[in-house]
Structures are given as structure tokens and as C-alpha cells.
UniProtKB/Swiss-Prot annotation:
GO terms for cellular component: fungal-type vacuole membrane. It comes from Saccharomyces cerevisiae (strain ATCC 204508 / S288c). The chain crosses the membrane at residues 34-59. This is Repressible alkaline phosphatase. The modification Phosphoserine is found at S123. It comes from the Eukaryota. Pfam families: Alk_phosphatase. Zn(2+) 1 binds at D330, H334, H484. Signal peptide: none annotated. The lineage of its organism: Eukaryota, Fungi, Dikarya, Ascomycota, Saccharomycotina. The gene is PHO8.
Amino acid sequence: MMTHTLPSEQTRLVPGSDSSSRPKKRRISKRSKIIVSTVVCIGLLLVLVQLAFPSSFALRSASHKKKNVIFFVTDGMGPASLSMARSFNQHVNDLPIDDILTLDEHFIGSSRTRSSDSLVTDSAAGATAFACALKSYNGAIGVDPHHRPCGTVLEAAKLAGYLTGLVVTTRITDATPASFSSHVDYRWQEDLIATHQLGEYPLGRVVDLLMGGGRSHFYPQGEKASPYGHHGARKDGRDLIDEAQSNGWQYVGDRKNFDSLLKSHGENVTLPFLGLFADNDIPFEIDRDEKEYPSLKEQVKVALGALEKASNEDKDSNGFFLMVEGSRIDHAGHQNDPASQVREVLAFDEAFQYVLEFAENSDTETVLVSTSDHETGGLVTSRQVTASYPQYVWYPQVLANATHSGEFLKRKLVDFVHEHKGASSKIENFIKHEILEKDLGIYDYTDSDLETLIHLDDNANAIQDKLNDMVSFRAQIGWTTHGHSAVDVNIYAYANKKATWSYVLNNLQGNHENTEVGQFLENFLELNLNEVTDLIRDTKHTSDFDATEIASEVQHYDEYYHELTN
């Protein structure tokens, strides 16, 4: 009888392969060999002509022209997410059926997403594939399958004379931004990630601009009187925000000060810049109080303005590399919350459109690439809700009726239950009129729906799950998981120069491994990740905690994600 062993993080997903190496080139057919030979001959001819007429030609690698790259990650956004958001947008804005999103206009290919140890990746391995151009295990942050730090595109760009930035709507220490700017064995090591991002590792500071949430990992646990907030998470007692400012970082942590930067389109930003606008994640777009939290588009406006100004003022600058993440598309997928997800996708599309207009008006060679690390939720825009033959419909208006996320409403309901413990009629009326009718626009709730919510009492995660399912059911939106799926994800791109656009298409058009996206970034910016890898071998990437403390950290991290997924 055959036995089967599940792969561990060190197990090769494909026997005979070594995922810690750069991906091998695809097998070349006879016809392709002929084409390659022809191209080589032409190339040699061009070199000879260049030697004879050196002023007439310039090799790409010797151009030394400024380049800007804005790399977008739509965390957890699969093809169905975009389809759902597009139809929602058409419906709520009374648009024709041929009206599409900005992203739609720039679709060029798709990406395969598996990690080194699973056909279903997580965000850490997915981002490491983009950042290091290699496959690693689920949970890996800027390290290979053997837990060795690997040089990232952002680090290499900084060392090559580019300015660098990271803009997100989750914690700045979360998996995607962390994988470009730090090296740790497991994604939950967010306190260590924060120190790397501020320059406490062999390369020193390599990030010029950090913007997003995650303030809690930058100041001590239990610091009730801290000027930065009331939910510090650091266990080592360090105040990294104070340390950063002492080391020359400009820090902004509230809307008022951010608005002064926004007004000048980032021109009054001083690099290095640290903007942390929430202790944890920035709220979902559907819940976001615009008086308190900046949008992704607003953050991007400031980031682009700051990086462009600094690049123009520095004659030695080669341009900039900026990573922008639509982070919470993923969280809406984990929570199976379609009303939140469509707003997250549309907010990202607005940010993408702003950057597109920036690139179109820039004289500097500029490339935009956007893709996802994976799909989340197993989303389908159809759902069989009866035992009879299924209807071929789904209803965007149900999502339009919802004015808050399940994440927001579970807290609202739990707070009310705690305040009115035992007052069952008050709680029932609150659920009916405040939560269901006012906040979700649901009037056809059943006795069974009410009974379930009442008996869940203060079980926040179960309340969230029930509310989101009530919306999904009525919209006839289906989900297959609270986790990730292995579906291929889309690649979108733009370049503002004709020759550059040809280069983009030659490298990213069609279907690719996610590591090939990382290779494209490396090659376009003329970087060498292997050289950077050699420089960071001594990076501290393991935890200082003993086994008991590590178990506690993992449990804390799992509990955080339990809130997202259940």
C-alpha cells in the first residue's frame, strides 16, 4: 500500500526541481532555434555597425537614462473580482455594458501563482516571487526555501541609484511590502520586519518612502500615553517612530498633517518619509472615514510627487521604483464580503488611473505593471440558491445597498450586545432596524436569520460570517473558501515609450510564472539580484523568542487572521 506525505516548507513541489534557483528557460523548439539564430546574427551585425558608428546607436544596458517603475499588487484579486467590480460599477453609475475599468484596457497576460511547497500560495511566497524572482515556501518573507535571505528588486534598485517606495492599505509590515524590504523566516515576525524597513540590517536604509497602516509595530506594547496611538505591539520596548525621526525620517501619522502633503502633491515631503495612518490596517473603503484616513489614490499622489521631485533634484538619480498594493481586496475575499471587495477593487482602479495619467504626462521612461499574488475566496459571480434549476443571474444592487463591511458591523453589534446584555428585545430590534435594514439594506430577512444572529450573542467572527453570507446569498455571489485558490491571475501593463512597450509585451504578454514578473522588473531596471543576495547573507532573519514565545506569536497571528477568515 502506497503512503503519501504532505509536503513541508522544504519539500520541492515538483520532484527534480530546485525552487531556490532562478527558473530555467523554457524548452526551445527547432523553429525557435532558427529564429534565435537569426536574431543573434542580426544582433552581431548591429554591434558591428555600432562600432563603426558609435554615435548612431545606444545599447539598452549602457543608456543610463532615467526610468520609473510603478509595480502594483492587487492582493487576492482574481479575474472574477474584476468582473464583479466592473458590473457593479456599470450598475450603480448607470453605465453602458461596454464601459470597462481602467485596468481592463491594459490587460496583457496572466500569471501562475504556486509557491515552492504548495499549489496554493500565500501572500508572502507570492510577493517573494515578485521581489526575489524565485519560488519560496508559504510564509517566507524575502528568503529562499532554505531560509536564506534573497536580494530583492527594491534593494537592488536602491543600490543602483533609484529612489524607492512602498504604499499599501494594510500594515506596512504585512507580507507584500515586507517581502520587498526585509528578510525573515515567517511573515508573523512583523516587529523584526519593521526594523529592517528602517535600515537595521546589512544594507542599511534602502526604502525612501513607506506609507500605509501598521503603526502598532513601530512603538512599544502597553504605551497608553504614546503620542502615536494606544495599541503598540512591540515587545522589545523600542519606539521605532522616535528612532526614525532621530535618524532623519519625516514622520506623519494623522490626516491633518497628511493633507498638507496632499495639497502640494507631495512636493513638501522630505525623504526618507514614514507615513503610518492606522495602528493596524486602514479600514475598508466602504467603512473608511475620509476625514481620518487617506485613500490609496491620495497616498499614491503624495508618493509620486515626492519621488518625482527628489529624483529631478538629484542629478545622480536613475529614477524610482514604487510598489503600490491594493491590500484589502484580499481581506474582503477572506471574509467572503462582496460589498467590501467591489469597493476595494474600484478604489484600486482609481489609483491605477491616477498613476497612468502621471506616466502619460511624464518625459521619463515609465512602466506600470499590475498583477495579483493570488486569488482569495474562490469567488464566482453566480450562485445556486435553490434546489431547482439555477437562475443565470446575480444582483449588483444588493451590494450597492450595503453601506458597511461585515468587519465593521460585527464590532458594532458586539458593542451593542455588551452594552445591553440581557435586553433581548432591544438587541433584536437593533439587529433588525440598525444592522440589517439601515446598514445592509436587507428587508427580507427571515426568522431563521434573526434567530441565528441573536444566538450568536457576542461571537464576533460568526456574526461577521453570517452577515456577509446574507449579502452574498441575496446577490447570488458564490465563494468556495475563506482562504486562497490556485487560479491564474491577470497581468496588466503600460509603458509611455513605444520601444519600451514592445519590450514589456515581449516579456509579459501571455501566461507566465509569477517569478517571471520579478525577472522582468530585474531586467528592465538592469539590476543584479544575485549580487544583492551576496551582500545580505548575514541578515538576522530568525526570531529571538524561545519555542514557547514563538508558539504564542503564531497563535496571536493566527487569531488575527481568524478575524479575517471567519
